[in-house]
Amino acid sequence: MGKEDKAHINVVVIGHVDSGKSTTTGHLIYKCGGIDKRTIEKFEKEAAELGKGSFKYAWVLDKLKAERERGITIDIALWKFETPKYYVTVIDAPGHRDFIKNMITGTSQADCAILIIAAGTGEFEAGISKDGQTREHALLAYTLGVKQLIVAINKMDTTQWSQARFEEIIKETKNFIKKVGYNPATVAFVPISGFNGDNMLEASTNCPWYKGWEKETKAGKSTGKTLLEAIDAIEQPKRPTDKPLRLPLQDVYKIGGIGTVPVGRIETGVLKPGMVVTFAPSNVTTEVKSVEMHHEQLAQGVPGDNVGFNVKNVSVKDIRRGNVAGDSKNDPPVGAASFTAQVIVLNHPGQVGAGYAPVLDCHTAHIACKFAELLEKIDRRTGKAVETSPKFIKSGDAAIVKMIPSKPMCVEAFTDYPPLGRFAVRDMRQTVAVGVIKAVDKTQAVAGKVTKSAAKAAKK
């Protein structure tokens, strides 16, 4: 397979604070990744000087994280590694303050979650206890549509690679992920030591009892031994090029001599020069003159591409961040008057009732929305109603809620356009709830502004 033919996939690494996420991820990036030797030697030298020699892989990741948090845009290649079949990007590791928010408004949807579980005595139990972060992260991943999962049982060296401990942990973890919603038969369970790099890329010699992992999905059965093989066995996601265009704007620039240039990530569909696009909820329709990515002109942009595109006769005042561009002839986006969503309250100190009006982060929009009506309280696992018209909901509860945005916003049902159908509820500077949109009451598009070039292009 030629280098260019490899598919790109995104993984998110989840697990308890001390499960060894950084060390494990650092190791993969270190061994198969985009970090050049010079950088690594520099990091190793610094780590040794600070007496952190033992943490060198985690140190690599900490350095990257620190630079990222300081707003230094890190060469994103550093967060990539290669398997025989894929280019893999690690989109975020929890522990990062905004992990939950990032996962939802996410720069990209993860195709697979890697759940790292620590095998140490007491560690495992703490990690998946009732109030554990692990449960929350796994639930989030599942709720937000990350349908594939790999479980890595880490720190096996601390248990002397005990088969009994491994089997005990697998039994417990299977129950745990089943409750979250995953089917254990479709999941690879891999014993590793991220610290020693054992069973990560090459089969470990420390566990002669280990016969390998196997999983069975609709696509068939696959088996392997190492974590790398498990990542390689992720099923390639279908990218939604066949859906109508949805492109949430991240920014709108005014560039001298060129004009107005909206910038954003194509979530679904394709964007081509000559297309007539409508921006919602601004309700402005115009023609796309050119599309570019990394300063190169594109014949077309596809899902996942971060593009800038030049539009005719539209001023920077007409459109803004949070607007969504779509094809004016193919299910164009419109604003939402209200919508119903399944909301899961994660950590709110009090009770949430009708009238609560926090800020919603949905794709690039950031808008206050009112909980107009609590329709029913539901069981998080089954989705079945347990109470109609509850007065309040609290942390741990899930409910179907009717929501009304305080000003026009463009959202979609999760089943139609996933990236525009999930949101984070922010209050008190933290994510207090997450939601998945079930249905949208779309405002009837009144005749908006149609530029001359759009009218002309439409006649063609």
From Swiss-Prot:
Stretches assigned to the tr-type G domain: 6-241
Primary site of residence: cytoplasm
Stretch list, region G1: 15-22
CDD domains assigned to the protein according to its UniProt record, in alphabetical order: EF1_alpha, EF1_alpha_II, EF1_alpha_III
Region: G5, residue numbers: 193-195
Any Pfam family: GTP_EFTU
Keyword entries, A-Z: Cytoplasm, Elongation factor, GTP-binding, Methylation, Nucleotide-binding, Protein biosynthesis
Subcellular localization(s) per the UniProt record: Cytoplasm
Chain positions with N6,N6,N6-trimethyllysine modification: 80
Residues modified to N6,N6-dimethyllysine: 3, 317
Superkingdom of this protein's organism: Eukaryota
Ranges for region G2: 71-75
CC annotations in GO: cytoplasm
Region (G4): 154-157
A GO MF label: GTPase activity
Residues bearing PTM N6-methyllysine: 3, 31, 317, 391
Stated family: Belongs to the TRAFAC class translation factor GTPase superfamily. Classic translation factor GTPase family. EF-Tu/EF-1A subfamily.
Function recorded in the entry: This protein promotes the GTP-dependent binding of aminoacyl-tRNA to the A-site of ribosomes during protein biosynthesis.
PANTHER family xrefs: TRANSLATION FACTOR
Protein name: Elongation factor 1-alpha
Lineage, opening ranks: Eukaryota, Fungi, Dikarya, Ascomycota, Pezizomycotina
Encoding gene (name): TEF
